[in-house]
Amino acid sequence: RGVWRFNWLPVHSPRGIPQSGPVVYRSEGLARRLGLRELWVAFNGYWPERGALIETCTFKEFEAAVVLANARENGVAGLTVASAGNTARAFAHLSQKTGYPVTIVVPSMCLQDMWYLETSSLVPTMVIEDGDYSDAIDVARRFSLISGMPFEGGVKNVAKRDGLGIVMLEAVSAMGRMPGHYVQAVGSGAGAIAAWEMSERFLRDGRFDGRLPRLHLAQNLPFAPMSKAWQRGNREMDPADLEASLIACISTRVLSSRYPAYGVRGGVYDALTATGGNMYAVTNEEMAEARDLFEECEEVDIVPAAAVAVAALGKAVTQGAMGDGEPVLLNITGGGEKRLKEQKKTYAVGGERISKDISDAGIEELLCGALKRNSSR
């Protein structure tokens, strides 16, 4: 049932992890506004009227479900996860639902946009007071080495990529064909790489004719290192575009990875090259306008990162990048937060506040404290 009906996922027995997928539908309102005859929306979030019941309001829940199920099948006792927001919420939620232990590391600069479906006291959460998402990744790796709970692995984890690739699986299932274009906002690049890899599987499978969907990927200015590198025609990003100070200027902190999988083999650069794709850079103002446009046309709220994708779609249409009648898949990576919070209680994210320079002894002390609290419950 749910996403587990797809046998291309690296999970054999997902017991105890019921997981619904995205809702994929043919747009009318936004399609009409943009002049697209074949615009399909993959909505990942909470929209009961459409049958979308992802209470974490993010497609990262598919990642978490597949990663946890895969780790459990392979005898992994627990995981350490770094996040700028959505991944933390997804792993915290499924950890509580399944009893599978995770330790989560997040940067304090992202807390204003973060929330859990459960109180943070139930999920060991470490808050980096003096760093960004990339610092959280570094600290999470150290927690992993000391605790023996493997680091979730980021984009290198095939279970993560296959989990995010569920969007393409559901889309092709709903559309009955491959999309000609795929639109998404990117931070680490994992979701875009997942869409590319899953599309390649469809072509190798032979049941779906056509070509690889052209990837149209977007970032939020002024922190848009991949977009800027791509527009320059470079495989390598400019270190100046990865400056941490730029992150404070964007509305989408979840897109703020300074370690994106761009120039590595099989990364975003290769995905764009293989698909004849393009990258776009979207300002905060353009993001806000696109968010309002989507809500007006489709009657549901979306998160800022998804609005970046909507803005990029508008740019692609204006540039004539999409042929008349070509099927377009817009990945709304998160939405329905306002609706969910009207119906369900959510919690601000808190936890142990630590420095990015915490000592190994300090990490050991925190882990011991977490073990004691868990054993007393």
Where are the model-predicted features located?
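A glycine-rich, Thr/Ser-enriched phosphate-binding loop motif common to dinucleotide/cofactor-binding enzymes
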Residues: R50-V66, G153-M168, V303-A307
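A short, small-residue-rich loop immediately preceding and capping a beta-strand
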Residues: E73-L94, T98-V106, P179-S188, L215, ...
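Small/polar-residue-rich loop-to-helix segments that shape phosphate-bearing ligand pockets
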Residues: V102-M178, A244-Y269
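Active-site/ligand-binding loops adjacent to catalytic centers
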Residues: D130-M149, R201-D301, K345-R377
